[in-house]
Amino acid sequence: MSAVSESVLSLSRYYLPVYRPCQVVLVRGQGSRVWDEQGRDYLDLAAGIAVCCLGHCDPDLVAALVEQAGRLWHTSNVFYSEPSLRLAQELVDVSRFAERVFLCSSGTEANEAAIKLVRKWAAAQGRLPEHRTIVTFHGSFHGRTLAAVTATAQPKYQEGYEPLPGGFRYVDFNHIEALEAAMVGGDVAAVMLEPIQGEGGVMPVVSGYLAQVRALCDRYGALLVLDEIQCGMGRTGTLFAYWQEEVVPDIVTLAKGLGGGFPIGAMLAGPKVAEVMQFGAHGTTFGGNPMAAAVARVALRKLASVEIAANVQRQSVALRAGLEEISEAFGGVFTQVRGRGLMLGAVLAPLYAGQASAILEVAVEHGVLLLQAGPDVLRFVPALNVSDEELADGLVRLRAALGDYVSRFGG
């Protein structure tokens, strides 16, 4: 490690130690490549946790940011700004269901807004507080704030934050009978789920499941809330993942790829709930920030293009095939590659169970950046415009990394 790296990393003692970053200082990015301060390049198949959907420093996004930065940075929602109004209109137009949009700065905020909207809607329906339950799913991830982490049905994220807010109920993912059993009492106001669980192991809904959930929501008078913070914005091959299931949600939450790397979140509200929240019912200082909205407008236009959809489909096939070939080359290091589009998870074989984090460290040594989705799954969420050459290079580096790991630790 260079003196520059050591100097920069020494500053980490001033940061609340809630993260455990890789010991690399990244200073520049272009497309699907990033460079550290020593000039070494890395092929980025993580995209800032599915955020940089158009790669690093996309010229159109940079131009939008620079132009808006020279005009107006921030107004708050005490005043209108054109970029946020235009973005809201464009999100409504492309969503195929929404009538209104709430803009915020992160996925957690979008989910908090959705949770509050559900509760407000139930109250407006005359439902007692005990009849405003929100059902979520084991393995889910909806954010880190107190309500969102309670909606996240994973104890490891909740430990030590008790007492948690009430009014949530957990059921098994992809288990329609369990969901109906949780709803039959008539106290459920909403069902909230990810079409593909990200942190839960890159686990997609089974075919037809969302339609069954929609039917149960209609039967028992509940809203359907879809968290597309990670799987939305073109990542699965369609702009919204729910399009592939042909269901109509009541609420959809977005973030990550919506800003192409600039912080922004959004909650989209359908006709049943669009007028529930009126003046003073909710708010945010930074939501709808002109710079974030200006960038998101360009990102949305590009992510909704047929070119991006076609590239996602083509590169998904190539990535899946490459992972399966690598697995076979090393005696079946993966038992399964699952997911949709460019949101794929490679499930580690029993011999390597629990070793995802260690594999990621070796991958960095070989110049490829990955993620994990739990201890047993390697997660791949590259830029949606990743090129043939970039993806091929990433697979070459991954093959070398796994070969190194297997030889060192696989026995």
Curated annotation (Swiss-Prot):
Pfam families hit by this protein: Aminotran_3
Catalyzed reaction equations: N(2)-acetyl-L-ornithine + 2-oxoglutarate = N-acetyl-L-glutamate 5-semialdehyde + L-glutamate
Keyword Amino-acid biosynthesis: yes
Subcellular location: Cytoplasm
Record's subunit section: Homodimer.
PROSITE patterns: AA_TRANSFER_CLASS_3
High-level lineage: Bacteria, Pseudomonadati, Pseudomonadota, Gammaproteobacteria, Lysobacterales
Swiss-Prot/TrEMBL cofactor(s): pyridoxal 5'-phosphate
Binding-site list for N(2)-acetyl-L-ornithine: 144, 284
GO molecular function: identical protein binding; N2-acetyl-L-ornithine:2-oxoglutarate 5-aminotransferase activity; pyridoxal phosphate binding
PANTHER family in the record: AMINOTRANSFERASE CLASS III (PTHR11986), SUCCINYLORNITHINE TRANSAMINASE (PTHR11986:SF113)
Stated name of the protein: Acetylornithine aminotransferase
EC id: 2.6.1.11
UniProt cross-references to HAMAP family, sorted A to Z: ArgD_aminotrans_3
KW Cytoplasm (keyword) present: yes
One cellular-component annotation, GO: cytoplasm
Main location group: cytoplasm
